[in-house]
Amino acid sequence: MDCVFCNLAKEEILFENDLAVAFFDSHPVSQGHSLVIPKRHCATYFDLTKEEIASIYELSQKVKKYLDNKYHPDGYNIGFNVNEAGGQSVMHAHMHIIPRYKGDVERPRGGIRKILK
């Protein structure tokens, strides 16, 4: 399969468990921008099993703790883009963990809505 997420190099992986892996985004929108993905190739969040969702959640907590200690962000945006119209560019389900910092945008109210504009 020709999927960039299915072919991650071991040294790129920050954390992993039986069903998921976490790594830094190769095109970050902020310092520490990370992704958590299922090991199994599936296109979107809605294709994940309950077990995969639980594994992704478990790793998201580890990533947050790591980012808190390393980068000291002031907040986070997290979420999944689904399909091309929803902003998904790699058709392998992935959770974005985007650290936010005071002053990174003029008025952060509205969170992700501001990033998208």
Report each predicted region and the residues it spans.
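HIT superfamily nucleotide-processing domains
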Residues: 1-117
